[in-house]
Regions:
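Active-site-adjacent structural elements that line small-molecule/cofactor binding pockets in enzymes
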Residues: 1-351
Length: 351
């Protein structure tokens, strides 16, 4: 088990202590640092900055949105960052949702699984640099020969040579079909709101992908990077209460009423009625009431909270469930140091 630092995206500006957090993560033996994007700051530029200030931490996107860039442009980012960082880059990709894809990027959200498969295939072709890139799929045809084409496009391969032709690609996935696809075509799964209580169910989804012809990985060499809030405290009830507004936001505000992939995660955990109530209250603007409706048990399913012994026990449970890296958010250097100290022996350190 390893620890990664999740620094997310800017809301609305980068935290002023971010350089200190990254330096502490490197000093305290964290394995990686990840950046995200939504509809503001991008996921790649901060990694270039942090990479210049570190020498060991792996640098990942969790996640870069497919619709933000063509596959070739995304591969160029990956190729460049991996070279600049000395082979430390991890490309984490995700489809986002229709509100962002259609509302922000102005693209249709249709067939997200098929688009993901094509996208990853093109990125791997670019990074392999074995031949000019060709894709006959409907979503990202290369060369483009559709409406408006001049007919002058030709297959190309990058003029810059990649440091690694096999930069790790991980996928953010929540539903069973997407998780199975991730196991088939990716090097790891970026899991959000993972609960060890459903480890057997996740294993079924993953095994479906591993069993497909041409699957890239198997269970033994596949990474599961689970985003997780860890709070070391003697006030367990207080920490649980503090987490509820965040969960209410994801359940009610990070998707449409009829299509919210985050809400579906919690329904599959066994909270369908509560999720419906939380979503309705949140969309009506009754956010405090929505947070109050979040069950304690739901928070405990997806959060690691308690004293050092309780935290170590929960981390061990997640490791038994298949998690290889816990991706945690930290508000300050002291929290980075506390997690490092508490989890020595449970988390693999590279000091």
């Amino acid at each position: 088990m390893r620890l990664g630092l999740q620094l997310g995206y800017w809301t609305p500006v980068p935290a002023p202590n971010t350089p200190d957090l990254v330096a502490a993560a490197e000093r305290c033996g964290f394995d990686s640092v990840f950046a995200a994007e939504a509809w503001g700051s991008d996921a790649f530029t901060p990694l270039a900055w942090w990479g210049s200030r570190t020498s060991r931490l792996r640098l990942g996107t969790s996640v870069a949105q497919l619709s933000a860039r063509t596959p070739a442009a995304c591969a160029m980012h990956a190729l460049t960052l991996d070279r600049l960082s000395g082979g430390r880059f991890i490309l984490g990709l995700g489809v986002s949702g229709p509100q962002v894809v259609e509302g922000w990027y102005g693209q249709p959200f249709a067939q997200p699984l098929a688009r993901t498969r094509e996208y990853v295939s093109i990125v791997r072709q670019v990074l392999a640099r074995e031949a000019p890139v060709v894709n006959n799929g409907r979503h990202y045809p290369l060369p483009y020969q559709g409406p408006g084409a001049l007919g002058l496009g030709k297959p190309l391969k990058p003029i810059a040579h990649p440091l690694r032709p096999d930069v790790p690609i991980m996928l953010g996935a929540e539903g069973p079909k997407n998780v199975a696809l991730t196991a088939e075509i990716a090097d790891g799964w970026l899991a959000i709101y993972y609960t060890p209580r459903l480890a057997a169910q996740y294993a079924e989804w993953l095994d479906e992908g591993f069993a497909r012809p041409g699957a890239r990985r198997c269970r033994e060499d596949f990474e599961i990077v689970a985003s997780c809030q860890i709070v070391l405290t003697d006030d367990r009830p207080g920490a649980i209460r503090a987490m509820k507004p965040v969960l209410a936001l994801y359940i009610g505000g990070m998707g449409a009423a009829g299509m919210n992939f985050h809400a579906d995660v919690f329904k599959r955990m066994g909270y369908p009625e509560q999720v419906e109530a939380i979503g309705r209250l949140f969309r009506e603007g009754r956010k405090e009431e929505a947070a109050a409706e979040v069950p304690d048990a739901l928070v405990e399913d997806v959060m690691v909270v308690g004293d050092a012994d309780q935290v170590r026990a929960r981390v061990a449970e997640m490791e038994r469930g298949g998690v290889t890296t816990l991706l945690v958010g930290c508000g300050g250097v002291e929290q980075v140091e506390q997690l490092s100290a508490a989890l020595v022996g449970e988390v693999e350190h590279v000091l």
